[in-house]
Amino acid sequence: MLVLGGGLAGLTAALHLRRLLPEARIAVLERRAGLAPEAIHKVGESTVEIGAHYFGHTLGLESHLRERHLRKFGFRFFSSDRHDSIDDVQEVGVSRYLSVPSYQIDRGIFENHLGEHARSSGIEVVSGAVIEAIDLGTDDALHVVSVRRHDAVERLASRWIIDASGRAGLLKRKLGLAESTGHPTNAVWFRVPVRIDVDDWSKDSQWLERCEHRQRWRSTNHLIGDGYWVWLIPLSSGYHSVGIVADASAHPLDRMNSFARAMDWLRVHQPRLAQALVEADAKPADFAFLRHFSYGCREVFSRDRWAITGEAGVFLDPFYSPGSDFIAIANTYIADLVRRDLAGDRIGPYVTLYSQLFRSFYESTLTLYRGQYGVFAHPGALSIKVIWDYTYYWGVLCQLFFQDRLTDLRMLGRVREDLLSSRALNDAAQPFLRRLAADTPPHNPRVLLDQAALPWFDDLNRSLTIQLDDAGFIERIQASRVLLESLAIEMASRAIKADPSIALWPETIAMLERASDLPTADGQLLAYPLAS
């Protein structure tokens, strides 16, 4: 089989196939010649739980992640728009590490390791390979790929083609599969050869001691304001990645599409970061921007024995770093389809079902971002949204992946109604959060909303480490639905207590209708112990 693209998605797909099919012939065609540089200029440095579990456990790379990359100190959110001081705004994050690790990955180091591992596993990795044409076979006919290398063109035949060509999107372009997400956002980003430590921005010992480890720099730090957020991601090579992601209508790209313009923009919206970059004399090692970076793909798996993974197919939004997650999910389905095909099974029904499942995961995750950038202007609504989104992610999608149930169609059928109920509740919660941010007064208290101090939240994260039998898995998915219902009721109850008219909002009514199985909640899910 041929994998088009030797980056993160392509190499992990090849390694996944090798682990499942040790005798299969696999070749990876990579346009770049030679090794990737450290701190390579790619988005996708921050992983979350599914991606980290996929790399570490599914592919067996945990020791490499621990030794060569940085354990992430979770996500951290500062409502710091137009503030000169980081320690006088709301902070949402953890004061200590939770049970399930995730990592800040230096893509150059990681992709070079993946390439070495692939070669040692008997996978042919061909560098300097430029794809000139793809002729897709149908029925049992082989696909043919024309590849230029060293001024010669070679035609390679393969039963399977897996497109992992990144934003080049070779198959998507060829087959006209592109579709809009309705999420018009832009991004600029650059890397600087210095460590950016937000702890250095404060002299307040009480603020510094909020966290057990003075390692806020290890977090994916989000500096947040109306219609935008800024990322700070550390890399093990000593660089720091800085990015601005913004709603296109609120913050036009032409105001930040060069390093000088980005610095001018930061001086207005995140002055403390701009000051830190100036004080460190931080010269960018690179700079890039993407207009309308979010996109979809109408089809990613085909009964004609081709598939698409990574950015060659879909890209949502980097706010919660889902890129590696969707590589993991797509690769899992692709590997199972290839395995079934090579075993002589009819894959058509599985292609249909896996496509529906992947589409469902993609669409439900998109709701976390689309139309939600206005929530960032409201610290209170933001803090609730973050908790809700985590609960939905850990309680539903993570459970499916960590329990190895993505391809267990029998079990997915048994929990179908609970999954649909959880998705419908999330679909109703996102408009409620949007309305809460738009129509209630914002407050930006000087507090740490410590997610690690919420016992149920800590337990939900820890639950990912516990392997379950069938009965236990069904119970877990049901418990996740009940937890989401309880959280929805508490979100509404707290808002109504502050303003009774919120009970009449259509968004409130719609959300509570989805949580109708629970008439009351104990009111403690959002009861943070506050650290000022």
Labelled PLM ranges:
Residues 18-43:
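Glycine-rich FAD pyrophosphate-binding loop
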Residues 16, 36, 117-273, 331:
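Predominantly flavin-linked oxidoreductase catalytic cores and closely associated redox partners
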Residues 338-532:
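C-terminal helical "tail/cap" subdomain of flavin- and related membrane-associated enzymes
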Residues 36-84:
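N-terminal FAD cofactor-binding segment of flavoenzymes
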Residues 9, 13, 34:
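Conserved Rossmann-like nucleotide-cofactor binding loop
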Residues 1-9, 27:
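Beta1/beta-strand and adjacent pyrophosphate-binding region of the FAD-binding site
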Residues 226-230, 234-236, 250-337, 341-373:
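FAD/FMN-dependent oxidoreductases across multiple families
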Residues 50, 95-116, 252-257:
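Short beta-strand to alpha-helix junction loop
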